[in-house]
UniProtKB/Swiss-Prot annotation:
Encoding gene, per UniProt annotation: gatA
Keywords: ATP-binding, Ligase, Nucleotide-binding, Protein biosynthesis
Assigned GO CC terms: glutamyl-tRNA(Gln) amidotransferase complex
Protein name, UniProt field: Glutamyl-tRNA(Gln) amidotransferase subunit A
Active site: 66 (charge relay system), 141 (charge relay system), 165 (acyl-ester intermediate)
Tree of life domain: Archaea
Length: 457
């Protein structure tokens, strides 16, 4: 559902009744897209809107927030047993901005535990089902954020993207999802997985709605030292672009058939060529070494003492610390902590972590060279259609599914997933990658492409 459609509904029946209807839909849903539904708070805000007390660009609009983004007084669990009882005492920067613009936070969206996964199957609260086929996953790690848009269980949503975690569910659910340039959106209040890679971003049913949400959440925040201090304003533009197909990024036959059809549509207006990125064959391995290394450091703070999951005290601090973490973290999180600790250990730091950072430099160099020739680069967002639940039981197979998305995070570039129709009743996404702070170009190009495929409907 788009903002324009929601406003028509509110105008005809009032915000309270419209929100009540959405809450009823969520309650009956089998998707498991929410961890926490903010029923009472949402209805109070809807009443304020009906009384004319709610103002702003998002006034009266229901927004879902991924459950690794801090919301004051509302459970923020990271889909983990470790934080299953954690209620933050502050709002994330992006949540502050939502509230300033009158948005209604309708709930906290389900996700992979600590954002570690591609299918939302690692969530302590259970898998998110795909609205197009409930036997399949909605993608990850922001699976709930994608599913709620596709199922009309929210009008807008926020996700976070460390290696494709917005773009993957956007592709699998047939909606729009943007991973902004690193630093455009403040990460203050985002519970960290891998600080140098992740970014908060918007998901929506149309480019106009996506752009509006980005306008709201982008901008200066001194509490995030990596924040670029730049605002964003969407400005329509209509120009012929130089579009590069990345040779090293592809997919299976079903995905490539639809991708090639999209390329032919793009050729009708834009100049299309092919570009090779030699470093990409090393990008996936480098990404996981860096991400897991940062995760092992970030997650060291969960000790069962100050907040979150705790146990009865034991006679030994070391035993207590180990037992809390063994019971509080799921298998995938423990696997990544272990591998990250190994990569950072004294004997292997140079062999793994430093080498991965050198690959990262090569990836950035390849992108820089490509953007000297092309305005945007394209690929399939995901190399396959949405997986069946349980299909990716092997961790390595799950990691390989991120092959098209992780280079963007290594370079800190913006990337958009655009729905380009269905194959066998399942959505396919086109990934559009831009140069630093070229979100306006991406969104305009994405709008043009999306309109030719029915805007994802």
């Amino acid at each position: 559902m788009r903002i324009a459609e929601w406003k028509e509904k509110v105008e005809s029946q009032g915000c309270y009744d419209a929100v009540s209807e959405m809450l009823e839909r969520i309650e009956k849903s089998r998707l498991n897209a929410y961890i926490t539904v903010c029923k009472d708070e949402a209805l109070k805000m809807a009443e304020k809107y009906d009384r004319g007390e709610l103002k702003g660009r998002l006034a009266g609009i229901p927004v879902a927030v991924k459950d690794n983004i801090s919301t004051k007084g509302i459970l923020t669990t990271c889909a983990s047993k470790m934080l299953s009882n954690y209620r933050p005492v502050f709002d994330a920067h992006v949540v502050e901005k939502l509230k300033q613009e009158g948005a209604i936070i309708i709930g906290k969206a389900n996700m992979d535990e600590f954002a570690m996964g591609t299918t939302t199957e690692t969530s302590y609260f259970g898998v998110v089902r795909n609205p197009h086929d409930e036997a399949r996953v909605a993608g990850g790690s922001s699976g709930g954020s994608g599913a709620v848009i596709a199922a009309d269980e929210a009008v807008l949503s926020l996700g976070s993207d460390t290696g494709g975690s917005i773009r993957c569910p956007a592709s699998f659910c047939g909606v729009y999802g943007l991973k902004p340039t690193y630093g455009l959106v403040s990460r203050y209040g985002l519970i960290p997985y891998a600080n140098s890679l992740e970014q908060i971003g918007p998901m929506a049913d149309s480019i106009e709605d996506l752009a509006l949400l980005l306008e709201v959440i982008a901008g200066k925040d001194t509490r995030d030292s990596t924040n670029a201090g730049r605002e964003f304003r969407f400005e329509p533009e209509d120009r012929k672009l130089r579009v590069g197909i990345i040779a090293e990024m592809g997919g299976n036959d079903d995905v490539m058939k639809r991708f090639n059809e999209a390329v032919e549509v793009i050729r009708e207006k834009h100049e299309v060529g092919e570009v090779s990125m030699p470093s990409f064959k090393y990008a996936l391995a480098a990404y996981y070494i860096i991400a897991m290394s940062e995760a092992s450091s970030n997650l060291a703070r969960y000790d069962g003492v100050r907040y979150g999951f705790a146990l009865e005290k034991l006679d030994s601090w070391r035993r207590y610390f180990s037992k809390v973490r063994a019971e509080g973290f799921g298998d995938e999180v423990k696997r990544r902590i272990m591998l990250g600790s190994y990569a950072l250990s004294a004997g292997y730091y140079g062999k793994y972590y430093l080498k991965a950072q050198k690959v990262r430099t090569l990836v950035i160099r390849d992108f820089k060279k490509a953007f000297e020739e092309y305005d945007v680069l394209i690929s399939p967002t995901m190399p396959a259609l949405p997986f069946k639940i349980g299909e990716l039981a092997d961790p390595l197979t799950m990691y390989k599914a991120d092959v098209n998305t992780v280079p963007v995070n290594l370079a800190g570039l913006p990337a958009l997933s655009v729905p380009v129709g269905m194959v066998k009743g399942l959505p396919v996404g086109l990934q559009v990658i831009g140069n630093y702070f070229s979100e306006n170009t991406l969104l305009n190009f994405g709008k043009w492409v999306g309109e030719r495929f029915g805007e994802g409907d």
